[in-house]
């Protein structure tokens, strides 16, 4: 029996580096919405393709934007 070749998953491109964004700002809601699911949850690193440090910045910016009422805490899924 021959072994089935295992494919390595393709590395996701970093969306922040592609858009040439150095700092994540809580006032940039258009950018932050890309990292929020349709249910209003913050998307995981493995889904978005950002680094650990950038994921922390994004999470902090989303939480600040929610506090300032720029983003909803949850979406109207129902």
From Swiss-Prot:
Molecular-function annotations in GO: small ribosomal subunit rRNA binding; structural constituent of ribosome
GO annotation, biological process: translation
Gene3D superfamilies in UniProt: Ribosomal protein S18 (4.10.640.10)
Keywords attached to this entry: Ribonucleoprotein, Ribosomal protein, RNA-binding, rRNA-binding
UniProt entry tagged with the keyword Magnesium: no
Listed GO CC annotations: cytosolic small ribosomal subunit
Pfam assignment, any one: Ribosomal_S18
Record carries keyword Ligase: no
TM region(s), chain numbering: none
InterPro entries from the UniProt entry: Ribosomal_bS18 (IPR001648), Ribosomal_bS18_CS (IPR018275), Ribosomal_bS18_sf (IPR036870)
HAMAP family assigned: Ribosomal_bS18 (MF_00270)
PANTHER family xrefs: 30S RIBOSOMAL PROTEIN S18, SMALL RIBOSOMAL SUBUNIT PROTEIN BS18M
Role played: Binds as a heterodimer with protein bS6 to the central domain of the 16S rRNA, where it helps stabilize the platform of the 30S subunit.
Family the entry assigns: Belongs to the bacterial ribosomal protein bS18 family.
SUBUNIT field: Part of the 30S ribosomal subunit. Forms a tight heterodimer with protein bS6.
Protein's name according to its UniProt entry: Small ribosomal subunit protein bS18
The species this protein was found in: Kineococcus radiotolerans (strain ATCC BAA-149 / DSM 14245 / SRS30216)
Gene this chain is encoded by: rpsR
